[in-house]
Amino acid sequence: MKFVDEATIKVDAGDGGNGVVSFWREKFVAKGGPDGGDGGDGGDVYLEADENLNTLIDYRFNRFYNAERGKNGSGGNCTGKRGEDITLKVPVGTRAIDIDTGEKVAELMTHGMKQMVAKGGWHGLGNTRFKSSVNRAPRQKTLGTKGEVRELRLELLLLADVGMLGLPNAGKSTFIRAVSAAKPKVADYPFTTLIPSLGVVRARGNKSFVVADIPGLIEGAADGAGLGVRFLKHLERCRVLLHVIDILPIDGSDPVQNALTIIDELEQYSEKVAGKPRWLLFNKTDLLLEEEADEKINEILEALAWEDRYFKIAAVSRTGTQELCDELADFMDTLPKEIQTEEEKAANKVDFMWDDYHKDAMSGKDVVTEDDWDDWDDEEDDGHVIYVRD
């Protein structure tokens, strides 16, 4: 199946049903009082994470989704039926962005997680709600509100512990083939990897972690060059980044400049991603003598002023790969779990429409008054009638 990690959809929550103006009619009870019922709420739109899905391809073909409208109220204090909700299944790791506002509406991280993305309209109030000691025959009602309409960009972010980045042909796919059962395509031309791939790595002590291989970056990727930043988003949930550097590029380019290009693109994309723990992997060390490889690596480290961890590997022969994986597994055990701060929770809170609608309605705002009533004498008044046998 084709891998699709981004799709645009339009969701339309159901409108609320209208309240009704009605009066009780019964033999020998000339003035039975108001009995208009409320309308029903409109249906909501939800997203639900499903571990059995791994692509958003279904939403490329069907982009429009509508929840059901609430039914209108009726006489006899009968409330209208609530509109049916609609639930859209998406892969685990999907987030929804409101295209118009840029607001993150939902982020689904675990199987079965369910979040609302569009709220149905509130029900209108019947005239019974407006009855009081000074208003015995209210002719006021409120209309149901419109359901929310949102245009959403669905983004599937891979859930991986370790993310790999580097220029095309740096050896990222070869590395993931060496340390896991994943078999991404490997060839001697740029952009062999066109879609992300995941591999499960087994380390010592029965430890394991997931590594993600994304397509290579080039200069200007943050501005859309090459495959752009479309796949950089998959690094946002990684705990550690592996920056793969080819110490002997086939095109004769400078490894230092290549490394600086990746660092610059990462910082332009996101300060948060750029601030994640990042290790350097010097690949293809088997193409040089050990002394020559060490000399070139030291030159790169000095030029980058690098003081963090680095490893020398040869992915094609698996030299140094197992030691690296063991170190990664131990290092991730020391990392604290990401805890969302109160500020981040407040920033991620989604405000839906109509939260204060009924409070405003009862205060007189948005009230509709039916002025064509003839008090109690109109035989066509939509009143509720009960026939009683003499």
Swiss-Prot record:
Record localization: Cytoplasm
One of the record's GO cellular component terms: cytoplasm
Coiled coil start-end: none
Binding site for Mg(2+): S173, T193
Positions of the Obg domain: 1-159
Protein task: An essential GTPase which binds GTP, GDP and possibly (p)ppGpp with moderate affinity, with high nucleotide exchange rates and a fairly low GTP hydrolysis rate. Plays a role in control of the cell cycle, stress response, ribosome biogenesis and in those bacteria that undergo differentiation, in morphogenesis control.
Subunit structure: Monomer.
PANTHER family: DEVELOPMENTALLY REGULATED GTP-BINDING PROTEIN-RELATED, MITOCHONDRIAL RIBOSOME-ASSOCIATED GTPASE 2
Family: Belongs to the TRAFAC class OBG-HflX-like GTPase superfamily. OBG GTPase family.
Name of the protein described by the UniProt record: GTPase Obg
Lineage of source species: Bacteria, Pseudomonadati, Pseudomonadota, Gammaproteobacteria, Vibrionales
